[in-house]
Amino acid sequence: MNRYNKVLWFISIEKVEIMNQNRVYFFDTTLRDGEQTPGVALRTPEKVEIAKGLVRLGIDVIEAGFPAASPGDFEAVQTIAREVKGATICALARANEKDVQKAIDALKDAERSRLHVFIAISELHMEYKLKMTRQEVLDKVKSVLAYAKGKVDEIEFSGEDAARSDLDFACQVFGVAIAGGATIINVPDTVGYMMPQEFASKIRYIKEHTPGIENAIISVHCHDDLGLANANSLAAIEAGARQVECTVNGLGERAGNVGIEEVVMSLKTRHDYFHDLQVNIDTKQFTKLSKLVSRLTGVAVPPNKAIVGSNAFAHESGIHQHGMMSNPETYEIMTPESVGAEKTSIVLGKHSGRHAFEDHLKNLGFHQTFTEEKINELFAKFKDLADKKKHVYDDDIIAIVVE
């Protein structure tokens, strides 16, 4: 190695190291895996609207669809590639030349294009779904990437069901993919089977034993079948993964994918724990984008959904309400404004306390001074009503005061 090449080698390693250690990249698959949510079907204009919202959010990569799946998917990817700027546009393809060519054709007008090639690599999938041997899978990966190389800006390779695969074989497949031109290696927990520490251990093993991995970014794609998609994604980041595949509101097959809002706000809120990893996401867009996706897909956001649910910043317990009025940090680890929500909601109900009730009276314009005895009387009437009704509205409070 001459001196010039040695300098280039160090620059290359330093560049990859920066990508691997300091920044987490976000790959949104709402328009592909998210659309696989049962009952969801998006038209091309709706997909374009969501894609533009993802750009405003600051998403690095938008997986626009699976062009070989249907003419509609091809049209959607092609339209997004042509009209949406500011993010890498990605298309999914199975490991065969026909799928790959469809994806390449759909992406041709993209500002920056990524081909996402996948094939199953677990023994279960290879035997019962693919009916292929390990060697046949290795040969297929090699030949397909040779066909695709140079026809798009970048290639991502996914080993479907990698989390349940033999790790040494997974490393071998990933090494072949990197040698063939893949610069992003995705490790899916396809069926949401992993435990966080277990998944982190697998990511570390892949990082240490995959040939050429220093020239690639490790990505993860976690499903939520056991409610662990966010925990597994964060554990993988701790272990060295630097791309997370996610969806808005956690949409996706079966129990869904990890919600981007959960991963990002975990990293932001606990930046001390994650050593200030760089996250280039405008979190104030979350609530607006969540509502847009919910409206267009017809999938309601559960009220108790972390970050974007309607109850995420709502407080009914009297003890909590008193704490919130004293200092919001007593019961909120982030502000509603930080995710684009309007404000904290103090909800009056049977669990509410006297402090919250008195504060609400003032908010309703009852500025006259009530005696302690009168406030106690009004509060007793409120509690009696709250025991009988699920919701106590402002009109109910006014009626109590003026009766």
Stretches with model-predicted labels:
Residues R32, P67-A69, L92-N96, F118-S122, ...:
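Active-site beta-loop-alpha junctions enriched in small/polar residues
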